[in-house]
Amino acid sequence: FQPTGIANTPGVEKIDAKKMDAQYAADGKLTADFPVYVKSLVMSKNVDDQALGWAFNSFMEGYLKNIKTTTGDYIYRDEMNAGNFLGMPYKVSNQIPTDSKTGCTEMFFGNWADLMIGDQMGLETYTTLDGTWTDENGVQHNAFEENLTGTRALMYDDIGVRHVESFAYVHNIKVI
């Protein structure tokens, strides 16, 4: 079994920023109205609001912090410097990719209490003095012959969305 993640879970609201009306995005470049739309879309599904929040990468954070009014004032910067975005906490993870060719990234909004993470047994480790393995360059190593200790660590985890209506996944957001 391979967890699919929020973005690939059937039923999760998927929003293509490049296909939005100009009020919200212009060819993937978000306007100040877009985050309000995403939050309203999720909240309209009667989602529990106790653990709502945002997740995006550092390019997205920088983009949002730099959105200005027509008079040059930053719209979100002060709030984001305090760790919130539209009144909800956000976290930055650079595991959320930005495509270097298109300059597009992704963002998530939802009730994170509805993202279930299961551990089957914690971390299981094994060590050996006589194991053999092949490294990333194709070179075979033998622990006994090279006076090494081989360690293997296993962790069985699973992740799943409990209520699909609790999340929105936005992709094709132009940030660079």
Question: Which residues does each predicted region cover?
Answer:
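Extended amphipathic alpha-helical segments with heptad-repeat/coiled-coil character used for oligomerization
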Residues: 46-48, 52-53
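Alpha-helical scaffold segments that mediate packing/assembly in large oligomeric complexes
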Residues: 1-41, 176
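Short glycine/threonine-rich loop-to-helix capping motif typified by GTGT followed
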Residues: 18-23, 64-71
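Sequence/fold signature of self-assembling virion shell proteins
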Residues: 70-176
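Short, catalytically relevant binding-site loops at active-site mouths
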Residues: 6-9, 59-62, 97-98
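Generic recognition of stable, solvent-exposed alpha-helical segments in well-folded globular domains
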Residues: 30-33, 55, 59, 146, ...
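Generic detector of multi-pass transmembrane helix bundles and their immediately adjacent loops
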Residues: 54-63, 90
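Long, positively charged binding patches that form subdomain-scale interaction surfaces
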Residues: 34-40, 59-63, 68, 83
